[in-house]
Amino acid sequence: MKVAIIFLLSALALLSLAGNPPAEVNGKTPNCPKQIMGCPRIYDPVCGTNGITYPSECSLCFENRKFGTSIHIQRRGTC
């Protein structure tokens, strides 16, 4: 009887963990072209993983290239 209870509790725990997708810890990797000459002046803000709002994904890529950082997109929109 104890074995059956342990098995059922283990199965329930596994099912509850399997239903939740893992959280994205480091944010979404920005889609950066190989070379960035400049960014279009289109305002489509993104929130970087550093807590700074960038005017666009291109602007975030430009900053990453300029300073050698690897800031990701925490979410679309302002921080």
From Swiss-Prot:
Main location: secreted
Keywords carried by this UniProt record: Disulfide bond, Protease inhibitor, Secreted, Serine protease inhibitor, Signal
Location(s) in or outside the cell: Secreted
Keyword Secreted set for record: yes
N-terminal signal peptide: 1-18
Gene Ontology cellular component list: extracellular space
Xref: Pfam families: Kazal_1 (PF00050)
Site (Necessary for sperm binding): Y43, D44
Disulfide topology: C32-C61, C39-C58, C47-C79
One GO term of the biological process aspect: cellular response to peptide hormone stimulus
InterPro entries reported for this sequence: Kazal_dom (IPR002350), Kazal_dom_sf (IPR036058)
Function noted in UniProt: Serine protease inhibitor which exhibits anti-trypsin activity. In the pancreas, protects against trypsin-catalyzed premature activation of zymogens.
Protein name: Serine protease inhibitor Kazal-type 1
The encoding gene: Spink1
